[in-house]
Amino acid sequence: MEIINGPVLPRYAAPATGALTSDAKISGQLLRRVHLRRRACGLQGDHYRAARRFFGFPSERHARSGWVWPVYCSYGSSSDGDGAAAADYDASGEEFVNSSVMEAVELRSVSDGFVIKMRDGKNLRCVQNNPRVLRLRDSAPHHAIVLKMEDGSDLLLPIIVMETPSIMLLAALRNIRIPRPTIYNVVKEMTERMGYAVRLVRITEMVHDAYYSRLYLAKIGNEEETISLDLKPSDAINIAFRCKVPIQVNRRIAYNNGLKVVQPTPSESYVSSDQFQYTRLDRPDDQPCFEAQEFDLVRNMLVAAVEERYKDAAQYRDQLFMFRAKKKNMI
């Protein structure tokens, strides 16, 4: 047997396709910070596992769940689609308008426009601001996060999302405490321990009926060192609300896809991204508030699941299914 002197160089086996690499690019520097500072930041147990699910390697996420959640990181030299540097969030501020989060539950299309159902049962009847833009042709209700423009136009921008991000945002709006940390709390704590702070969230563009958003981070003590992340709007808005930073919308998107309220209501229910105050609506007189009951069931189910009380969560789930079936028969 012969002995070969010299260093052993491991051979890297490239994946069969480059789809995962191109579909889920993530900054190497940010990954190194996450792994090298794991112990220094104290990200152990549930916090670390949640962080891995959020910033995990594409192959790992793909193998476990069958889908990839792309997280794109860019630094000062990148572009966010409008020609301005992605991390320089002050460069194109005139193209964006501040917005506030409303306590909306779902969006439904009707024959003469749209209906936004609020958390406490109020219905806002709306029409499209730009009639030439066609969208949401089906009449089925969709869970939605609704942003209100703060430029005096009072336009509403509904963003259709999954049920969980919508419920998590409503829980944050109502200051409902969840015992176990959510992924949004983990991201907030992780960025702070890494020396960064969330500064801004922007809804930048709409491509094939899907909104794109960016989350802007700045180095604490050095505002010129910035990072921008491409996230789903539902996640970016949840993080922005918990970090108490402005949520801005591209003016073109707000004009083309925004809705105008045509039915006046006694009062409005929204949370300002600057002042974070809200006006609580009165419940309908002598009428059951089905939305509030449904919200309580969903909240109890999620809290039980987070606390690993799976038997209780299953009971709340069955109650929720029965409640929704009963409400559907009443319509």
UniProtKB/Swiss-Prot annotation:
Gene Ontology process terms (BP): protein ubiquitination
InterPro entries on file: BFN_sf, Bi_nuclease_dom
UVR domain sequence ranges: 291-326
Keywords: Hydrolase, Nuclease, Nucleus
UniProt domain BFN: residue ranges: 126-261
GO CC annotation, single: VCB complex
Main localization, broad class: nucleus
EC number: 3.1.-.-
Compartment list: Nucleus
Stated induction or repression of this protein's expression: Up-regulated by wounding, insect and fungal treatments, abscisic acid, etephon, salicylic acid and methyl jasmonate.
Record Pfam families: BFN_dom (PF02577)
Source organism, top-level taxon: Eukaryota
Coiled-coil region: none
Keyword Nuclease: yes
GO molecular function: nuclease activity
Protein family per UniProt: Belongs to the bifunctional nuclease family.
Function: Bifunctional nuclease with both RNase and DNase activities. Involved in basal defense response. Participates in abscisic acid-derived callose deposition following infection by a necrotrophic pathogen.
Protein name: Bifunctional nuclease
Gene that encodes the chain: BBD
